[in-house]
């Protein structure tokens, strides 16, 4: 893989974006509300893009050190790119738990759209099929199918609880214990899938004869750790800034009388900024398998990383009193929360079928 030591554009993105965020943070009293919010949003996105480039450099180095192929390295980078999204969602969940949950589920559709669009640019053979890495066909497609079952099953359970007034909270919603159990189970699926990915598919799929000058030696572990720490730390800063922008956006739309689903749709796009940055940056550096892994991970990691972490955060916020509940139900069961779960089924099934067909 190339590019781990080339260019300092990521530093300029982090520095410039951080400066814009600082303006929005410390000069907000002297600026119009919309301008301060725009500084937080745009500056935060720039920082997120820079942090993703730093994390790509880190996983590239790890891949060279331990012999990972580009797809596995890209999957690990995709996992790291969830950090700004989770930071942003944490602020939204604390302020508006119901909206935060809806935004989390809607990011699945944004990710599915990005994966579908990016897959359309992949080269195809005479039969019209694209060459897909074995890990995508055998691991990611299993996650797509499992996610379809999770969304359908959870949505139906919520529907039945509400219809029959069942459960500890009379069908009004899911409690702390429910969120812990569901979130923990979903997160365990991702842990197992990641271990299987590294165990079965981390090596090169095909050996290629090296032609030309000898490859550059891999970076030191200290350099790898430095890129990783910078990427993670700045992704938290960027996610925090985008989260502040999201709060202003939700409040403004609510004050203007727009339905909350409009704000949720817009927030789902901003929540996916880290994954988009990873895809664009990897593709621009001609790391196509890394970009494909990031695009696929943006879909498969929503139900098994982002959603369970959001559920666990809701449980923790409720237990610590940050979220107040009258009946003990933390996540309400209503039309919107149930429908976003049930509507997660179609894109998962479509992607599972599409990947299976191209992987034959």
Language-model segments: residues:
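Hydrophobic alpha-helical segments, chiefly the membrane-spanning helices
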Residues: 1-360
């Amino acid at each position: 893989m190339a590019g781990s030591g080339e260019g300092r554009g990521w530093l300029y993105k982090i520095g410039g974006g951080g400066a814009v965020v600082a303006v929005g943070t410390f000069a907000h009293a002297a600026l119009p509300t919309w301008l301060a919010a725009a500084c937080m949003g745009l500056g935060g996105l720039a920082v997120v893009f820079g942090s993703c480039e730093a994390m790509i450099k880190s996983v590239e180095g790890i891949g060279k050190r331990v012999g990972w192929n580009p797809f596995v390295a890209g999957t690990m980078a995709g996992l790291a790119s969830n950090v700004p999204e989770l930071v942003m969602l944490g602020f939204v969940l604390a302020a508006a738990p119901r909206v935060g949950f809806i935004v989390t589920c809607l990011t699945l559709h944004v990710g599915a759209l990005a994966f579908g669009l990016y897959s359309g640019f992949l080269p195809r053979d005479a039969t019209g099929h694209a060459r897909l890495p074995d890990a995508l066909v055998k691991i990611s497609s299993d996650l797509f199918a499992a996610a379809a079952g999770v969304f359908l099953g959870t949505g139906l359970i919520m529907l039945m609880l509400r219809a029959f007034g069942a459960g500890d909270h009379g069908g009004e919603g899911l409690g702390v214990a429910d969120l812990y159990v569901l979130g923990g189970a979903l997160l365990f699926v991702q842990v197992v899938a990641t271990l299987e990915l590294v165990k079965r598919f981390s090596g090169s799929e095909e050996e290629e004869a090296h032609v030309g000058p000898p490859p550059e030696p891999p970076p030191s572990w200290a350099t790898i750790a430095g890129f990783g720490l910078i990427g993670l730390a700045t992704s938290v800063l960027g996610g925090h800034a985008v989260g502040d922008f999201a709060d202003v956006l939700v409040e403004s739309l609510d004050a203007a009388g727009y339905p909350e689903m409009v704000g949720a749709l817009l927030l789902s796009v901003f929540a996916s900024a880290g994954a988009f940055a990873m895809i664009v940056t990897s593709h621009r550096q001609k790391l196509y398998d890394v970009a494909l892994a990031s695009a696929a991970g943006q879909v498969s990691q929503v139900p098994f990383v982002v959603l369970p972490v959001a559920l666990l955060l809701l449980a923790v916020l409720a237990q610590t009193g940050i979220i107040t509940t009258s009946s003990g139900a933390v996540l309400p069961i209503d039309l919107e929360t149930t429908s976003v779960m049930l509507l997660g089924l179609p894109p998962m099934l479509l992607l599972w079928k599409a990947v299976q067909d191209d992987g034959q």
